[in-house]
Design a protein with these regions (language model features):
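Glycine/GP-enriched mid-protein hinge/lid loop-to-helix segment characteristic of carbohydrate kinases
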Residues: 101, 170-266, 350-353
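ATP-binding/phosphotransfer module of carbohydrate and carboxylate kinases, centering on a glycine-rich
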Residues: 1-50, 55-99, 109-126, 130, ...
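Glycine-rich phosphate-binding loop and adjoining helix at the ATP-binding site
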Residues: 23, 99-191, 195, 286-298
Length: 353
């Protein structure tokens, strides 16, 4: 499938404004190609140019950055669904602060789950929007084994009794808005992936806490996913005391489970850096130190030289990554395309005509 570079540019700008030169570098495209693409985003009002606030006056005119244009005509709804929270956020495109939010009632079936979401969307539309059609996409972040994105096939969910259901399709059929489903922990993995101070060139990440474990493998600053964008399912790793039970909550076998995970996975990808995060280790950092010392006693040079780094759970940035995902989903719906321009339009674009 051909890459839609207009969508790729928007997804980059969701997370951080940047210059055309930076886009050239990130997408490996020529200046003229990027200039043409950006023009196709500025004209419909999806992107705007802004001058950098900090620059050296001796260098002449300040550089211009590109940023997403705040747009109330394109809205999305983000659903955050886990054991301690079921909440809906109404978002305008390009604005990370929600228009509105509402706590929803925890339910245990997909039918009731969809009913709660349909009702809050109708409420948001009536109270805050000129029309319901302004909501272009729904993004759900939940604790589930799923094929992520628009496929949205859910095999099991820690909070819902239904199994093997096409959740995204069921929501679209019931609500009439395209839906994208993600594992809740995917947002945390994206937080780690995009953290400027972390080395994600070659690393594995384990997020442990609240009774669950999430695994991320980063190679060349990209996260590995399974078939149809499936989020890695690590709970079935054959640890004798139960892998998720031992790392999801601190207990007598947590140290052994962490060592097991590192020794089982790191050699497969020749990984030399492990990032450990989550509430399981917040008050037990000595466990990480002990595992690091145990690795240094290994004869295998890969394990001997492997470095473990602890990273606290950054809730605010985690939510921001989920918001960025909702913007990405909205772009999939908008599906921007190159607009062919006539000779007359091109002539009008030049000064003096």
């Amino acid at each position: 499938m051909a890459v839609n570079y207009l969508s790729e540019i928007l997804k980059i700008l969701h997370r951080k404004p940047c210059s055309q030169a930076e886009l050239c570098q990130q997408l490996s495209l020529s200046k003229s190609h990027i200039h043409s693409l950006v023009s196709n985003l500025i004209t419909p009002g999806l992107v705007e140019k802004v001058e950098q606030t900090e620059y050296n006056q001796e260098q002449g005119r300040p550089r211009q950055n590109l940023q997403i244009t705040h747009n109330l005509h394109y809205c999305s709804v983000l659903i955050v669904h886990h054991s301690w929270e079921f909440k809906a956020y109404l978002l305008a495109y390009g604005v990370t602060e929600e228009i509105a939010s509402k706590e929803l009632k925890q339910v245990n079936t997909v039918e009731l789950f969809i009913k709660e979401i349909r009702e809050v969307i109708d409420e948001f539309a009536e109270l805050y929007l000129p029309e319901r059609e302004a909501i272009k996409a729904i993004t759900v972040a939940t604790q589930a084994t799923i094929e992520q994105g628009s496929s949205g096939m859910m095999y099991r969910n820690n909070l819902l009794s239904d199994e093997n259901v096409p959740l995204a399709k069921m929501m679209f059929d019931a609500i009439g808005i395209r839906t994208f489903i993600y594992n809740y922990a995917y947002g945390h993995m994206l937080t780690l992936l995009h953290a400027p101070s972390l080395n994600t060139e070659n690393a594995m990440a384990l997020s442990c806490g609240e009774g669950s474990v999430a695994l991320g493998v980063f190679l060349d600053k990209k996260m590995l996913l399974g078939r149809n964008n499936s989020f890695p399912e690590c709970s079935h790793l054959p640890f004798k005391y139960g892998f998720e039970k031992s790392l999801g909550i601190y207990g007598p076998h947590t140290q052994e489970a962490l060592m097991f995970a590192i020794c089982a996975i790191a050699p497969i990808y020749n990984i030399n850096h492990v990032i450990v995060a989550g509430s399981c280790f917040d008050e037990h950092l000595d466990i990480i130190y002990k595992v690091q010392q145990e690795l240094k006693r290994q004869s295998d040079p890969l394990l001997h030289n492997l470095v473990i780094e602890y990273r606290g759970l950054e809730i605010e940035q985690h939510l921001n990554e989920l918001i960025y995902l909702s913007f990405d989903a909205l772009v999939e719906v908008l599906n921007p395309q190159i607009q062919k321009r006539s000779l007359q339009d091109l002539v009008k674009g030049y000064d003096g005509f």
